[in-house]
Amino acid sequence: MNALKERKEAFVSGLEGGSIAEINLVTTVALTAYFGWQLLNRRLDSVPLVVDFLLNWAGLLLSITVYANDPVLLNLLIAVPCIVQLQILGRSSQRKTQPQKGKESARLGLDRKPFITAYRGGMLIITCLAILAVDFPVFPRRFAKVETWGTSLMDLGVGSFVFSNGLVAASALLKQEISGQRPPLWSRLVSSVRSAGILLALGVARLVSVKGLEYQEHVTEYGTSWNFFFTLALVPLAMILVDPICTYVPRVFIALLLSVFSEYLLQKEGFLQFMIMSKRDNFFNSNREGILSFLGYCAIFLLGQNTGFYVLGNRPTVNNLYRPSGQSWQQNRRQRLSAWDKWTSVTPLAGLLAWFFITVALFQLTMAYHPYTVSRRFANLPYVLWVAAYNLGFLSMYCMVDSLFNLSQHSNNVPVTLDAVNSNGLFVFLLANCLTGLINMNMNTLDSTLTVQIAALFGYATVIASVAIIMYKCRIFIKL
């Protein structure tokens, strides 16, 4: 048993990752699947659930396993049949969900947008698939988390999870601005502590189970006692301290300051050597990766919040490009607005594209002068900018798909599998972690045949998708 544990730990250690271009191509499968589903949905009364699963779960599973070396072919295999089917079916004489223009609410508020649900659902699915697939040889080692420097699919996944949480968290800030009512500090603190308490409990449970069951662990990922649940729990608590500052300083600047400070520490003489080589003889030394990377994850969360300011509302608000606003730009345009106010009051797509190009430029500039490269282990400045640029870019493309199909912000044209996962995101993520542990404890993942590996992964995906769909159909929503 110990020998197998050591083999499994070695299997995910010392890795160097792959190229950003390949990661983009592989994850584009999620976007292609969403596009294909929308094509079919325009012609069918309803897209069969099996087709939905094959597109959004099986397609992503194949992209990180069997078709990992040829993602372009897989994208074509998904898109072309959907287009052919579209031509065979022809245009339906009656469509059930054509957007009705002119019925937009005159009242400023938040609306559920299909592209955000699809983006978050796809991100959660590929994250859940990867945390088990990484233990099988069919999952390329370049997609697994790197040891220290480099980029990989799984490195992107953890950052995207935090970015997505930040985007959703922006809704509470927007509601406060729109209503003009801000809850007292103690109320926000109690709410954050309650949510953090559940995540901390999950983190402790994972820690105890890993140590008690002698489950394989990758110490340089977060440390000997730290895990991702602790990071998820503490980030919103840290935002309670940051929020008062954000009244005067935009979140984007605070995010950059946190990342620059982290970068300053890493480039101080001797600090990087300490982070990589030091003994793990006390709590700080033992968990130094989790503690230092916390600054970077806070920065990513803040950038996600900033994104929510211009994508969640039902119309552009004044200066929503960089701050939460409850003033509708349409209501204020009759007044004399400054050029700055006009340029920074944007639609979702305009805001996403603006920040995408800014972030890509900052990333390229940083990489040109940075002595090292991206590091998820330390969540350094290049990592923060890479995660932000990726998510902004893919959100832009999801938004373009909605525009192409003329989906209104009130429409519910979202694949059930994506909506189901998105509705119970953290619970699904927890379920995936538990199933991953059970499978690893009862199966030799390293020596399985290709057929057994694919069968196990498809079975795992089917169970998670089924649980999510059943909960969704039964209107069971668990907010952890």
Curated annotation (Swiss-Prot):
E.C. designation(s): 2.3.-.-
Main enzyme class: transferase
Arranged from A to Z, the UniProt key words for this protein are: Acyltransferase, Endoplasmic reticulum, Glycoprotein, GPI-anchor biosynthesis, Membrane, Transferase, Transmembrane, Transmembrane helix
Gene Ontology molecular function terms on file: glucosaminyl-phosphatidylinositol O-acyltransferase activity
Q: Which residues cross the membrane?
A: 20-40, 47-67, 70-90, 114-134, 153-173, 186-208, 228-248, 252-272, 291-311, 343-363, 381-401, 426-446, 450-470
Positions annotated as glycosylated: N406
Supply the InterPro entries for this chain: PIGW/GWT1
Kindly tell me the pathway this chain contributes to: Glycolipid biosynthesis; glycosylphosphatidylinositol-anchor biosynthesis
**Cellular-component GO terms for this entry:** endoplasmic reticulum membrane
UniProt membrane topology term: Multi-pass membrane protein
One GO biological process this protein is involved in is: GPI anchor biosynthetic process
- Tell me where it resides: Endoplasmic reticulum membrane
Role summary: Probable acetyltransferase, which acetylates the inositol ring of phosphatidylinositol during biosynthesis of GPI-anchor.
PANTHER family annotated for this entry? PHOSPHATIDYLINOSITOL-GLYCAN BIOSYNTHESIS CLASS W PROTEIN
**What family does this chain come from, according to its entry?**
Belongs to the PIGW family.
Q: Name the chain's protein.
A: GPI-anchored wall transfer protein 1
Q: What is the name of the gene encoding this protein?
A: GWT1
